[in-house]
Amino acid sequence: LSEMKEIYFYTVNPDNLETEAVSAVVKSDFTDDPNDLMVLISDSLEDAGYEVGIKSAELEGENVVIDFSSGMCPVSGLTEKEEKAVLDAIAQSMLDNLTEQNGVVFRIMGEAYESENFSFGRDYVYMKNHHK
């Protein structure tokens, strides 16, 4: 029987659109790979009603780069408040678990993040790691 451990990350409470901490029990050999983390975060957001379209989550230099698919949540179909809550939950989850990374960058299909509500440069750091 393999050892288990608990990891913490964030999701969105659909009732008040606040980010809230949740946890999942994973095998102790669960690595802090951004793609593995993204699966947990996506599943949790999907439970809250936000089906996130992720192309990839990878380390790029000192940042974690989350590349979203176009035409899906959080890029389209959300209010500004919902979109911000989803982005905050993803960014905070990444930084809390990948403590060596400096920040989180969001892109759409490898390009700058531009949605109905937000527009960020291709290398804009959305959230910086306050643990560093």
Residue ranges and their predicted role:
Residues 1-132:
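Bimodal "functional hotspot" detector
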